[in-house]
Amino acid sequence: MLRFLLLGLLAISTGVQAAYPLGTMTCDDIASFASEAMSWRKEGQTREQALAALENRTYNDPVEKKNLTAIVDLVFGPYGRNWTVESAGNVMRTDCMTGR
């Protein structure tokens, strides 16, 4: 009985420590990508070009593509008008660290 309890606790603690919803990415990875995407916008790329670039990336977890697509939408949307390359990364890092 104790063995099953310990296995259950191990499974729960492993699940809590899992990287979801970021996949294998860290908040710094998210911030770095946001800055990269903002640099694309500043260089004159369109949202469609940025989304096409996402298709060429390799992902360790399906949720990573979903997250990066959401960042592209933010960067190329109304919020991105007021961001710099640096501030885009800072905003996304802060949002990630606070769980948003």
Language-model segments: what does each one mean?
Residues 4, 19, 50:
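Residue-level hotspots at or immediately adjacent to binding/recognition sites across diverse folds
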Residues 18-26:
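Cleaved targeting-peptide boundary
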Residues 1-7:
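Sec-dependent signal peptide recognition
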Residues 13-16:
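N-terminal signal peptide c-region/cleavage motif recognized by signal peptidases
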Residues 41, 45-100:
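Compact alpha-helical subdomains of small soluble proteins
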Residues 38:
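Functional surface patches built around histidine and acidic residues
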